[in-house]
Design a protein with these regions (language model features):
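Short amphipathic, positively biased membrane-proximal segments
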Residues: 1-335
């Protein structure tokens, strides 16, 4: 074979690329590679499916209710509404007792929960959250003992104030926790999830207090329940819009869709009942509060369930990365 023939064969792929629409970049011809279909790696997902079980969304709900209830308790106390303050404080303690039990059940052994307390890591949402939960439970317990039995007056009042300070972080840190994972539908909603969780927590705290408190004293609780429920609905819709149609797809089918629809219906109906009937009827207050509580729980379950299809289908991981790379490359060319 002649030298010229070898050179022709050597550069034939380059000529073929140029004939197919390749572009020169100063060093030769660069092939325009067609977009590849998103695939898994040898049949495996890019990400691992979350290993959390049913205890975790229940913990999201219980912890949020506890955290928001402590703030409601202190607000009612400062306003002189001791009946509402006591019942909100009891709701906070109930959530603080149930939450560690749910976490321990998910972890499998009590010593795993204890081991998370041995080292404090400010950069770990789980470590910070465990310490917040433990501290919250301790001070809320002291505050309840003081409120019920009148002992330790100074310590009791201080504990109630500290409980109210720790309440908002307890109600929202779980949103930071799941947003800190690599699950696309959680991570990409990291700006909106804390608002959704805060609103849901406020709604559930107000609803629980409205159920437990006599109608005449429950006005602030009803207003918190209604406002929280409406804000929750709005924040959840905002979260989906900012995710975009593609990333929010898991909310449009299966369990996430069913729970989300249920959350909308229950929260909306509960807010209406609480607003228009609960001011005069104890039965209506209980019914409206129960509907709002169920709606808040359903919202947490919807978010939890959406994480599974979002993590197992590789397109939700690969496509956003590809879009970011394309945007970066486009910016570099313009610069």
């Amino acid at each position: 074979m002649s030298e010229q023939s070898r050179e022709q064969r050597r550069y034939e792929p380059v000529h073929a690329v140029s004939r197919q629409g390749g572009q020169p970049d100063g060093r030769g011809w660069v092939e325009e590679v067609p977009e590849e279909e998103t695939r898994s790696y040898y049949g495996r997902s890019v990400l691992k499916e979350p290993t959390w079980t049913w205890e975790i969304p229940c913990y999201f709900f219980a912890g949020g209710l506890a955290g928001a209830s402590s703030g409601l308790a202190l607000t009612a106390r400062l306003a002189g509404n001791d009946k509402l303050a006591r019942r909100a404080l009891l709701a906070a303690l109930g959530g603080a007792v149930v939450s560690p039990a749910l976490l321990i059940s998910d972890l499998g052994r009590p010593d795993r929960f204890y081991n998370m307390l041995r080292v404090f890591k400010p950069t770990s949402p789980m470590s910070v959250g465990t310490w917040i939960l433990s501290s919250f439970g301790a001070v809320t317990g002291v505050a309840v003992v003081h409120d019920l039995f009148g002992v330790f007056p100074r310590l009791g009042r201080l504990s109630e104030a500290i409980s109210a300070v720790l309440g908002p972080p307890l109600a929202t840190y779980t949103a930071v926790l799941i947003a800190d994972t690599s699950v696309p539908i959680w991570h990409e909603a990291r700006r909106e999830l804390p608002l959704v969780f805060a609103a849901s927590s406020a709604a559930s705290a107000g609803a629980a207090a409205a159920i437990l408190t006599p109608v005449v004293d429950a006005g602030p609780a009803r207003r918190l329940a209604i406002g929280g429920a409406l804000l929750e609905l709005g924040a959840a819709e905002l979260m989906k819009r900012r995710l975009g149609k593609f990333l929010a797809e898991p909310y449009e089918s299966g369990k996430p869709k069913r729970y989300e629809r249920l959350a909308r219906a229950l929260s909306g109906l509960g807010a209406a009942v609480t607003a228009f009937a609960a001011r005069k009827s104890r039965a209506a207050a209980v019914a409206g509060g129960a509907l709002i509580l169920a709606g808040a729980a359903s919202e947490r379950w919807s978010i939890f369930e959406a994480g599974f299809p979002s993590s197992t289908d590789p397109k939700y991981t690969v496509m956003p990365q590809r879009e970011r790379l394309n945007a970066r490359d486009g910016g570099a060319r313009r610069g």
